[in-house]
Amino acid sequence: ICLGGLGKVTLAPAPGQTNWPFWLTVTSNDPVVACLASQYAGWSLSHEKFFALGSGPGRSLARKEPLFQELPYEDSASRATIVLEAGAPPPEPVVAKVAESCGVSPDKLAFIYAPTQSLAGSVQVVGRVLEVALHKAHELKFPLEHIVDGIATAPLSPPHPDFVTAMGRTNDAIIYSGRAHLFVRGSAEAAKALAEKLPSSNSRDYGRPFAEIFKAYKGEFYKIDPSLFSPAEAIVTAVETGETFRAGAIDEKLLDASFG
């Protein structure tokens, strides 16, 4: 649902030996639209004490985020769906706002929500392993129109009743064990540069479980180095030359420290 029907998510046994035996794999042959126009949790929704980030295909109907000024994609539909990382349904004012922004009546709007502390929440966040690679590529100013296909995988994090711990585990699954393979048009040099810059190890904040990093910044999420939000390992294939480039590595010790 988060991918707008343009991607597939599967759960399968881990590749090789690992303490965490099941991994999510995400594939899309239209990854820019699937990941950035739909799955990316970029729509901030709030009312009084309620706050959540919205993802899902309804975002491309509303086009409220600056990101859409850079995406050559528009959508129209009589129904809309928004996915929230939240433990409760949105209040009526948020429902009304989203319905109006999407151009649908409230009875044609569906919200799907799951708390981060749940298994469903773990699946939703870890399932963004391909999306974070696309978002990082965008932040690096790589031409999005050159990304033609993508595959990514990461371990399913065990849920935890504490929000910060649960959030940390879902992020660590990607930061320390996520692997993304992008297929791109353009020169081999551009593909190599992208592979080298994509991995999370390029971040100044790399090297500790995410929950520790979050606490070190006193819960101020936006003070964390944005380049941390990337897969641990990147593989980029230049489809016009057939060359493949790799960078980064999985860190099982940090993953074990996070997952417990």
UniProtKB/Swiss-Prot annotation:
GO terms for biological process: formaldehyde catabolic process; one-carbon metabolic process. InterPro entries: METHMP_CycHdrlase (IPR003209). SUPFAM superfamilies: Methenyltetrahydromethanopterin cyclohydrolase. It catalyses: 5,10-methenyl-5,6,7,8-tetrahydromethanopterin + H2O = N(5)-formyl-5,6,7,8-tetrahydromethanopterin + H(+). Pathway: One-carbon metabolism; formaldehyde degradation; formate from formaldehyde (H(4)MPT route): step 3/5. Keywords: Cytoplasm, Hydrolase, One-carbon metabolism. One of its GO terms (cellular component) is cytoplasm. Gene3D superfamilies: Methenyltetrahydromethanopterin Cyclohydrolase, Chain A, domain 1, Methenyltetrahydromethanopterin Cyclohydrolase, Chain A, domain 2. One of its GO terms (molecular function) is methenyltetrahydromethanopterin cyclohydrolase activity. It is found in: Cytoplasm. Its main location: cytoplasm. Its EC number is 3.5.4.27. Belongs to the MCH family. Catalyzes the hydrolysis of methenyl-H(4)MPT(+) to 5-formyl-H(4)MPT. This is Methenyltetrahydromethanopterin cyclohydrolase. It comes from Methylosinus trichosporium.
